[in-house]
Amino acid sequence: MISSKLKTIIKNIFIKYKLSKDHASISADALINAELVGAYGHGLSRLRMYCDRISKKVINPKAKIKVKKISQSIAHVDGNNSIGFVAADTAIKTAISNAKKTGIGLVAVKNSGHYGLSGYYAESKQLKKV
């Protein structure tokens, strides 16, 4: 219950800073996860930093993330200076898709900001389905 209310608050803050609802939701989930696992340095304490970076145009809140297929197993994600959570989410989804087809998925990310707790992506629900 608390985390759903907290998610709504964080999501609304990110939306105020011009992130799409989807990108705000992805970002809020990652911040809350960091708090729930005790990695506070990657959680809510960073919210102001992300908002400041958006205000200073270091993070592009309207970034169009591009995925370049290198092979059936390998891809590059260009985050276009997006908030890192969204680029990382795109990367893990791309890696999973590639792995389902070929048995391995390797994705590199560039032009992206801080993406929080890396273990969040390694332990994602999507990855557990592979």
Predicted regions and their residues:
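Short polybasic/polar patches that bind polyanions
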Residues: 15, 100, 126
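Alpha/propeptide regions of enzymes that mature by internal proteolysis
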Residues: 32, 84-110, 122
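Glycine-rich anion/phosphate-binding loop at the beta-strand->alpha-helix junction
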Residues: 28, 104-130
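Short, well-structured alpha-helical segments
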Residues: 21-32
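N-terminal amphipathic, basic helical "cap/leader" segment at the start of enzyme domains
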Residues: 22, 36-46
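Active-site cofactor/substrate anionic-group-binding motifs, chiefly glycine-
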Residues: 43-96
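Generic N-terminal amphipathic, Lys/Arg-enriched alpha-helix
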Residues: 1-17
